[in-house]
């Protein structure tokens, strides 16, 4: 395909946009591609090893290390493949369990870089292109940042590149066996991290669409190979049934709990929670940061590689990689969490690949510029310098910032919090990092004595009730109807009431409520609710009584309109019409309760039969704050609610209740029943 133009622009066009009729260079010997890939993997592993974290690094790292060490169940989606493979690395004599899992991450990320090097060589025929692709991706700050700590993202990266390598092999010589390998790689990715579908699903669907003919037997076999790795999720209920110390989701207790755990419904509330402008701004900030890391040369090589791929016989793969990149950026940019960039880490795979392809296109296009023979002999040397200079620049930029080899701060904080806590204590912790530190301190390191650990986030889930001691459940049941802010504030109060006064209660809550007679002491970095000597025991002290000062009866409620049949998780309207006989005192709220299998007692509490173990008790779904309405006036409010998907199908009775803080009036049953299905 001739390219027209004059001057320097005509000379540069062969480099920036290679013609689609260009023949691929001869493939290098297999041993050379293997040696280049092995060298890239070892170089990356050496960098990761020198900056490897000696302990857990906070947040999910401590929990994952504890779950692997005790063979428990991690937070949604469970990560069964990580738990199984991580246990093999946990047996290595490398020090703490978190360090062993950090080495697992390093091996996974280094393997991903080596595989990416092989893919680039297979696509271009240039070993230097593979070296640059693997090192540019592996030494980026995003990949390096998760390759030297105990996290799940490095293994996700390896599985994504494995699927890409399987697709390239199938593309070179389409055959059913290679298609099955691609399907199995896609299934392994889904058995670990659900976002791998953004990368593997387009590749697998394109391979199926491009296969001619497509007999039913081929489709069935491909589907079977893709679904076979998903059987790993059965590991979660099997281990949950063994009652490990760390049992997120209680997946053996109910198929509904198992399904909610593996599909990550808990985190769906964070997805697509930012506007289009915020997503564009976030993606732009990430692009600017990566551009500063790679420099002008790296950005130019990526552009050349992308344009060259779209103009070559590998155009379908280029389009698929562009689509995967867009999906990852949309997902990560719209995810409302602080460290959202970790979900966009697989984007470095196509960027690194395009960088390597850009070098290959530049090396192939330079001879077309009619350079002198002396300069042409320097082309391989120049390519080698670029392939090494860009990764060297990346390593110099990130080494000091990403070096975790001396980072003991999370473990030191856990030691400061928990050292000296007696074995009969109850430890109530709020926040991911404090809970991860406690789980790692006691379950991974095996520190004793072991107190009762109670993460506040567990207390709001129905699957957690069967895992808790029976004497603890009433306290959580009383706090469950409260809004989240008040729940955190009053939970220590209710726990303190059911505890033996001599049993210490530790918490890191900022402002917990202190029961009468107790004092709040600062013990290390935690607060301790204690009963000073000489005061009466809990059995001798008056219990908290519900306040019944507000009148109840037909004068309060005029009517309620609720659809008779609702679908779980689907929004629906509720209309309340209230007549106030006198102004509502400041601070009082009107709450609507959905209860199943429960009946109000004369004392005002909601009694739940023990055989239901609180699984059928439904927390407060709606809170309606009433203003100081003049007496005799009507107040009408339209509520737009969303019933929890965790509610079991069946009939629910509606109750009305006035509350202020811990004070409750007796629930008033409404003439309305809702059926969830």
Q: How should these model regions be labeled?
A:
Residues 310-315, 357-396:
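Signature aromatic-anchored transmembrane alpha helix within multi-pass, membrane-resident enzymes
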Residues 38, 42, 103-124, 159-166, ...:
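Transmembrane-helix motifs of polytopic, lipid-linked glycan transferases
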């Amino acid at each position: 395909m001739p390219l027209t133009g004059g001057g320097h622009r005509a000379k540069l066009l062969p480099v920036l946009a290679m013609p689609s009729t260009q023949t691929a260079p001869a493939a290098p010997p297999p041993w050379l591609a293997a040696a280049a890939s092995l060298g890239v993997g070892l170089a990356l592993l050496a960098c990761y090893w020198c900056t490897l974290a000696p302990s857990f690094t906070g947040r999910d790292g401590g929990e994952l290390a504890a779950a692997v060490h005790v063979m428990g169940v991690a937070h949604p989606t469970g990560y069964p493949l990580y738990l199984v493979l991580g246990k093999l690395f946990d047996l290595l004599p490398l020090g703490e369990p978190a360090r062993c899992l950090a080495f697992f991450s390093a091996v996974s990320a280094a393997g991903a870089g080596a595989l990416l090097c092989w893919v680039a060589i297979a696509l271009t025929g240039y070993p230097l292109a593979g070296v640059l692709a693997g090192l540019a991706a592996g030494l980026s700050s995003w990949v390096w940042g998760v390759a030297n700590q105990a996290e799940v993202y490095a293994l996700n990266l390896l599985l994504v590149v494995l699927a890409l390598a399987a697709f390239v092999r199938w593309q070179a010589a389409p055959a059913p066996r290679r298609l099955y390998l691609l399907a199995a790689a896609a299934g392994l990715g889904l058995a670990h991290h659900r976002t791998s579908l953004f990368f593997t699903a387009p590749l697998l669907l394109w391979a199926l669409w491009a296969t001619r003919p497509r007999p039913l037997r081929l489709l069935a076999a491909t589907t079977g190979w893709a679904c076979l790795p998903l059987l790993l999720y059965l590991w979660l209920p099997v281990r949950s049934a063994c009652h490990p110390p760390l049992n997120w989701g209680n997946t053996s207790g109910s198929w509904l709990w198992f399904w909610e755990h593996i599909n990550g419904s808990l985190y769906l509330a964070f997805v697509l929670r930012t506007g289009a402008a915020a997503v564009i701004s976030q993606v732009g900030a990430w692009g600017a940061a990566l551009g500063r890391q790679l420099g002008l040369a790296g950005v130019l090589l990526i552009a050349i590689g992308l344009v060259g791929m779209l103009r070559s016989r590998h155009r379908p793969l280029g389009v698929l990689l562009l689509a995967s990149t867009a999906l990852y950026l949309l997902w990560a940019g719209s995810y409302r969490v602080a460290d959202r960039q970790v979900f966009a880490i697989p984007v470095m795979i196509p960027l690194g690949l395009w960088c390597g392809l850009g070098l290959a296109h530049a090396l192939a296009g330079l001879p077309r510029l009619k350079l002198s023979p002396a300069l042409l002999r320097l082309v391989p040397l120049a390519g080698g310098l670029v392939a090494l200079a860009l990764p060297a620049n990346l390593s110099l930029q990130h080494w000091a910032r990403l070096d975790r080899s001396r980072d003991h701060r999370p473990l030191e904080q856990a030691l400061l919090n928990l050292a000296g806590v007696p074995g009969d204590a109850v430890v109530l912790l709020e926040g991911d990092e404090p809970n991860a530190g406690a789980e790692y301190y006691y379950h991974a390191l095996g520190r004793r004595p072991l107190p009762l650990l109670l993460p506040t986030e567990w207390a709001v889930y129905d699957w957690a009730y069967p895992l808790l001691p029976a004497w603890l459940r009433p306290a959580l049941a009383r706090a469950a109807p409260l809004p989240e802010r008040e729940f955190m504030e009053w939970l220590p109060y209710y726990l303190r009431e059911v505890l033996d006064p001599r049993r210490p209660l530790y918490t890191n809550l900022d402002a917990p409520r202190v029961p009468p007679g107790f004092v709040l002491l600062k013990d290390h970095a935690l607060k301790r609710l204690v009963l000073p000597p000489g005061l009466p025991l809990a059995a001798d002290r008056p219990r908290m009584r519900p306040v019944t000062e507000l009148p109840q009866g037909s004068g309060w409620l005029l009517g309620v309109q609720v659809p008779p049949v609702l679908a779980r998780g689907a929004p629906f309207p509720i209309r309340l019409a209230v007549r106030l006989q006198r102004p509502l005192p400041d601070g009082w709220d009107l709450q609507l309760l959905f209860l199943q299998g429960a009946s109000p007692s004369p004392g005002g509490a909601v009694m739940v039969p023990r055989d239901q173990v609180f699984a059928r008790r439904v927390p407060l779904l709606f809170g309606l704050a009433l203003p100081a309405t003049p007496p005799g006036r009507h107040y009408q409010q339209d509520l737009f609610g969303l019933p929890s998907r965790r509610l079991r199908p069946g009939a629910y009775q509606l109750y009305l209740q006035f509350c202020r803080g811990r004070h409750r009036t007796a629930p008033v049953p409404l003439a309305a029943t809702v059926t969830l299905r």
